[in-house]
């Protein structure tokens, strides 16, 4: 009888150790004075796969080592046939660290927070969204029509749910039914942060995209590729491939534009731009940090949209009658930048001050990113 009593605590301890046996450990360090909230971290898959192989490639869950709360994650392929990264959504306070455990078990199902899709029934739209905001680009079917537009279109939202599939199915875009709408006008401009060559003081717009490829599609990150046929830029033919990613929890997209210029040149000036309305709005710029923010004039019915761009290689701001431009340089024919939007009616970014602060803090976080380390589990 006494032996059973003494053995019980030992059995409980052993069962707890088995429950939390770690296949791997991820340490996330935040050296910034800013908190990171709902941020995606990337863990290279190959070393992680080797750790899992030792345990027979069992399915796994990821938990907060302190709270034991299960975290959402995604396997990222980036268009490849094999896994490239493990993506995990984390929140880390300023000047703090976080430890995650990978443990055996079947992960909980999570609702998708991002989506991207080709929409042939709407004249080749390519649309994408997350739990904050939505966007679309126009395809070749719209080119040359009176609906044609060169830039990125914004679809504002005030719901964390995905809505594009439902709204496209209903052919209903321009009325707010309580969850958002597309009231943003693009026209023959760069819209909400598109990019184009800038030669002889002129923007040389490409046509609309002609090919697409979905590289990943949720639940935490959606990535896709848009291709454009070559077009004339001051007497030379130029082509571009754009890769666009949108993470859950972010107001901004990541854009990588790869240009090819006739003759093999890899340097020519480009601009990233935002359409400017005729009525007064608020403009913020920091050329040294490569930030431009625009808080549009209020629409009495639909509220206010804020648009912003962050370009590490940005150098000169150009203010035109209808556009705000940030001139940038290519690195080997490529450029990376961020662009996105927010809506006052979503009540997360309510005014110009909060939008411009968001953009500045976004740039600061990219300058001091989270440090991610992967280790083998300490117990089996």
Regions found by a protein language model. Give the residues of each.
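Beta-strand-rich recognition/accessory modules
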Residues: 85-87, 309-380
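Solvent-exposed N-terminal domain segments of exported/luminal and surface proteins
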Residues: 105-203
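Extended, loop-rich substrate-binding clefts of extracytoplasmic carbohydrate-active enzymes
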Residues: 170-247
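Acidic (Asp/Glu-rich), glycine- and aromatic
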Residues: 240, 252-285
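Short, well-ordered beta-strand segments enriched in hydrophobic/aromatic residues
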Residues: 24-30, 132, 242, 253-261
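Polysaccharide-binding surfaces and accessory modules of carbohydrate-active proteins
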Residues: 23, 27-29, 50, 56, ...
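Alpha-mannosidase-like glycoside hydrolase catalytic domains involved in N-glycan trimming
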Residues: 22-116
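Bacterial Sec-dependent N-terminal signal peptides
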Residues: 1-25
């Amino acid at each position: 009888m006494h032996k059973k009593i003494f053995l019980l605590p030992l059995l409980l301890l052993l069962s707890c150790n088995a429950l939390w046996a770690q296949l791997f450990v991820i340490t996330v360090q935040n050296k910034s004075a800013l908190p990171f909230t709902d941020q995606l971290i990337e863990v290279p898959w190959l070393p992680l796969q080797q750790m899992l192989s030792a345990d027979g490639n069992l399915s796994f869950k990821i938990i907060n080592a302190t709270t034991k709360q299960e975290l959402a994650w995604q396997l990222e392929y980036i268009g490849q046939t094999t896994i490239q990264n493990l993506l995990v959504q984390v929140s880390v306070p300023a000047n703090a660290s976080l430890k995650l455990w990978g443990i055996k078990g079947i992960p909980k199902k999570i609702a998708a927070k991002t989506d991207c899709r080709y929409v042939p029934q709407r004249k080749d739209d390519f649309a994408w969204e997350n739990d904050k905001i939505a966007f679309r680009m126009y395809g070749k079917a719209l080119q040359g029509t009176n609906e044609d537009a060169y830039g990125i279109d914004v679809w504002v939202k005030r719901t964390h749910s995905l809505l594009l599939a439902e709204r496209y199915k209903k052919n209903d875009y321009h009325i707010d039914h309580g969850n958002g709408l597309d009231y943003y006008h693009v026209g023959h401009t760069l819209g909400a942060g598109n990019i184009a060559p800038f030669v002889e003081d002129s923007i040389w717009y490409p046509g609309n995209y002609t090919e697409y490829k979905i590289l990943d599609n949720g639940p935490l990150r959606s990535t896709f590729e848009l291709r454009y046929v070559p077009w004339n830029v001051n007497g030379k033919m130029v082509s571009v491939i754009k890769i666009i990613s949108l993470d859950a929890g972010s107001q901004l997209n990541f854009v990588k534009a790869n240009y090819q210029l006739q003759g093999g040149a890899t340097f020519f000036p480009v601009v990233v731009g935002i359409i400017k309305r005729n009525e007064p709005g608020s403009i913020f710029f920091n050329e040294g940090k490569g930030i431009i923010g625009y808080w549009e004039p209020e629409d009495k019915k639909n509220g206010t949209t804020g648009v912003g761009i962050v370009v590490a290689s940005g150098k000169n701001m150009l203010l035109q009658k209808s556009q705000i431009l940030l001139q940038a340089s290519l690195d080997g024919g490529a450029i990376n930048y961020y662009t996105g939007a927010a809506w006052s009616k979503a009540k997360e970014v309510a005014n110009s001050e909060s939008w411009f602060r968001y953009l500045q803090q976004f740039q600061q976080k990219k300058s001091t990113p989270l440090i991610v380390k992967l280790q083998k589990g300490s117990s089996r």
